[in-house]
A protein has these predicted regions:
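Residue-level signal for inorganic ion chemistry
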Residues: 68, 92, 152, 184, ...
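Compositionally biased, low-complexity flexible segments
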Residues: 1-33
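Anion-binding (especially nucleotide phosphate/pyrophosphate-binding) glycine-rich loop
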Residues: 36-183
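N-terminal low-complexity, intrinsically disordered patches enriched in charged
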Residues: 11-15, 21, 101, 135, ...
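Generic structural marker for isolated residues within well-ordered, non-membrane alpha-helices
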Residues: 132-133, 321, 368
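Phosphate/pyrophosphate- and phosphate-bearing ligand-binding catalytic cores of soluble enzymes
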Residues: 43, 50-53, 186-349, 354-358, ...
Length: 390
């Protein structure tokens, strides 16, 4: 199957390998903003804010909650057949929804399923990501332990090519099971066909086409040790060097401590976590762009200041969005309104309670303009915007 198009596979139960056990399922979290006993739930003129980690966003004309793959597909087909705009919601940790809400059907994917067969892992799209990571660590498997604490659902991870602390899901995902709205078939896409890149994928590049149903991973049995540590701060906290391995549970716990210290682990009592985590991606610059950027750094900050630089590939260099924001004068806690920069991490924009989406966007635009004025770099938002834009 070429990278240009997903080809329908022969009909079979979606997401199961021949001879594998069915996914163990569990009902959605009863502590969530909408509780129900199973099956499709339909609500009308319902606020979407409780379904996002920003706690922002107006109402949807209709909100459907689906707990099985068949329910997800049926809801998508119904919307497509009627020409109704469709918004997919998983954990809501990467969404910025406009104050006017969504004029269409919002589909909350609340499927559950965790299947571990040796080192092969299969997750239903609605599976809570942090729980799944914890269970793989309990099984002493390596590969996603440094992605602990990232809010949201498993189905969102390939879309964004979620990554943190030296790991990206693209390094362990083998296949993604998705519903193709164009062919109206369930398709199985290989890692290569997902076209992963930094915080991007084929799914993000063509958001109207695919609905992720299940995600398959190949993890590593390293006798209870982690994957080689790629993030210097993690290695330093563990007293080892980059490239070393440590007990997999120690790697996870260290990442959780790092994330908590930056307000990146959800806590309803901590407004620093009323966010989407990192609001901007780290810029990737060509050699010419980096040279121009470095000249601006010297001009603004002096010869002794060296900007962060990490090889993105053979031709390009990645720099730090958080560093750019800070050096442009936007410090931790910046802002006077109900939307402010986190008090723990300059890369997170937060709702301090009572904010509107427009408050958040005004802050984001101010940061983007300030960084561009200071260094000539235009930051790009990481969360998906719905009904609004920067």
């Amino acid at each position: 199957m070429g990278a240009g198009r997903a080809v329908p596979r022969a009909p079979r139960e979606p997401g199961l390998r021949p001879g594998s056990r069915p996914l163990r399922t569990a009902p959605p979290d009863p502590a969530g903003p909408f509780s129900y006993s199973g099956g499709v739930q339909e609500l009308h003129d319902t606020a979407l804010a409780p379904l996002t980690t920003f706690r922002l966003g107006g109402p949807a004309d209709r909100l459907i909650t689906a707990t099985t793959d068949d329910e997800v597909i049926a809801a998508v087909r119904e919307a497509d057949d009627s020409g109704t705009p469709l918004l997919l919601i998983g954990g809501g940790s990467n969404l910025v929804i406009g104050d006017k809400g969504f004029a269409g059907t919002a589909l909350r994917i609340a499927t559950r399923g965790f299947e571990l067969d040796g080192t092969r892992l299969e997750l239903a799209a609605g599976e809570v990501w942090t729980d799944a990571v914890a269970r793989t660590v309990e099984a002493r498997l390596a590969g996603i332990e440094c992605l602990a604490g990232i809010p949201g659902s498993a189905g969102a991870t390939p879309i964004q090519n979620v990554g943190a602390y030296g790991q990206e899901v693209s390094s362990t995902i083998t296949e993604v099971i998705a519903y193709d709205r164009e062919s109206r078939e369930t398709v199985t896409m290989s890692n290569a066909e997902c076209a992963f890149s930094y915080r991007h994928s084929r799914f993000k590049g063509d958001p109207e086409r695919f609905v992720v149903l299940r995600v398959r991973f190949e993890l590593e049995d390293a006798a209870g040790l982690s994957a080689p540590l790629r993030y210097a701060e993690t290695a330093r906290m563990l007293g080892v060097g980059p490239g070393d391995r440590v007990p997999v549970d120690a790697a996870r716990e260290t990442v959780l401590k790092l994330r908590s210290g930056k307000g990146m682990v959800l806590d309803p009592e901590d407004h620093d976590t009323w966010s989407a985590g990192s609001f901007f991606t780290n810029p990737i610059l060509t050699r010419e762009e980096f040279a121009a950027f470095h000249a601006r750094v010297v001009e603004r900050l002096g010869d002794g200041v060296v900007p962060p630089a990490y090889p993105a590939d053979d031709e390009n260099t990645k720099t730090s969005a958080a560093w750019l924001i800070d050096k442009s004068g936007f410090t931790k806690g910046y802002g006077t309104g109900p939307a402010r920069i986190s008090t723990k991490h300059t890369l997170a924009l937060t709702n301090r309670g009572g904010a509107t989406t427009e408050d958040l966007l005004a802050l984001a635009r101010e940061v983007v303009a300030g960084v561009h004025e200071a260094f000539g770099i235009t930051l790009v938002n990481e969360p998906v915007t719905v009904g609004v834009s920067l």
